[in-house]
Amino acid sequence: MSDEREVAEAATGEDASSPPPKTEAASDPQHPAASEGAAAAAASPPLLRCLVLTGFGGYDKVKLQSRPAAPPAPGPGQLTLRLRACGLNFADLMARQGLYDRLPPLPVTPGMEGAGVVIAVGEGVSDRKAGDRVMVLNRSGMWQEEVTVPSVQTFLIPEAMTFEEAAALLVNYITAYMVLFDFGNLQPGHSVLVHMAAGGVGMAAVQLCRTVENVTVFGTASASKHEALKENGVTHPIDYHTTDYVDEIKKISPKGVDIVMDPLGGSDTAKGYNLLKPMGKVVTYGMANLLTGPKRNLMALARTWWNQFSVTALQLLQANRAVCGFHLGYLDGEVELVSGVVARLLALYNQGHIKPHIDSVWPFEKVADAMKQMQEKKNVGKVLLVPGPEKEN
């Protein structure tokens, strides 16, 4: 992961949003020294901005820094991209608190996905060229203006897809697809519980459920988001703040559900398991219950660990149920597997069956606000970061 290390190590530590020093005297012939200084400044390379995680803790641990731009020099099998949009994921929030095990050593540029334009192609790359619009799935390092990545981790963006939609697609939709279809074996007539149904993965999962006939979707979210959930395809929105989702589901479906998508962990995994019908599956793909505030909460860690679900093979056999675990970060070497899923997702997009729902778009300068938007669960859909100017949300 040399790209991330180079970005972090070369960062100047200066906020790129600060105005440059004024040089009014540079045009004054009576001040030759000032003129020479201005000329030297003009000849210096431009700066590229990046976000750097400098330590574990609150929102202030992610700093906007800059590094001198250099001519792109991708190695064999690599591409250099100019990024236009980057995805923010729950794993990035956990990484900031030191809770994500796939993060390279600090300081590091976070970010697992983005979309942009190819500006240079390395030796041996024949299926990409300068000017191509691509989206990228990477272990980290995507929150910067330019990045060099392996070509096999990039995917061509469909003509009708925007950069923002492309930056919102990969992590959320790959996760939702593989949980529902590869693990869950979603079939017509099935019922699915989608936790955090207004989040990026949740919205993606609900759209994918709509591609299968007669699927009933139970979706948990705060009451203010229920209208958006219904518009996206949730059959039965449930306000987890005021009701017990287990009781609500049992009222409608006494036998339970076929698939539980569990990003929560802790005691909620056990609840999901007990909601399963015979031949049902709970697929756990996150530990959102660990995050209770901007900084790491040791009590939440202890509580979630203590309540971690455990089941024996004999119990699974007797119940005719399955428990599965999914972690996209550990599939970074499974190029063919992931590429096949992306191909199916792009086909669904081109057919009009799925479309990433963008909650908000934030400039790099407001990364703290973007993280807060997601961590406080105010978002409906995907939260994005962009190197360019702020957009109205």
Curated annotation (Swiss-Prot):
The keyword rRNA processing does not apply. One of its GO terms (molecular function) is oxidoreductase activity. Residues 1-40 are annotated as: Disordered. Keywords: Acetylation, Cytoplasm, Membrane, Mitochondrion, Mitochondrion outer membrane, Oxidoreductase, Phosphoprotein. Its EC number is 1.-.-.-. The modification Phosphoserine is found at S2, S18, S27, S35, S44. Its main location: cytoplasm. GO terms for cellular component: azurophil granule lumen; extracellular exosome; extracellular region; membrane; mitochondrial outer membrane. It is found in: Cytoplasm; Mitochondrion outer membrane. Possesses ATPase activity. Plays a part in calcium-regulated keratinocyte activation in epidermal repair mechanisms. Has no effect on cell proliferation. Negatively regulates mitochondrial fusion in cooperation with mitofusin proteins (MFN1-2). It is a peripheral membrane protein. The modification N-acetylserine is found at S2. Belongs to the zinc-containing alcohol dehydrogenase family. Quinone oxidoreductase subfamily. CDD domains: MDR3. The lineage of its organism: Eukaryota, Metazoa, Chordata, Craniata, Vertebrata. GO terms for biological process: negative regulation of mitochondrial fusion. This is Synaptic vesicle membrane protein VAT-1 homolog. Expressed in brain. Also expressed in glioblastoma cells. Induction: Increased expression in glioblastomas and on wounding, in basal keratinocytes. This expression is calcium ion-dependent.
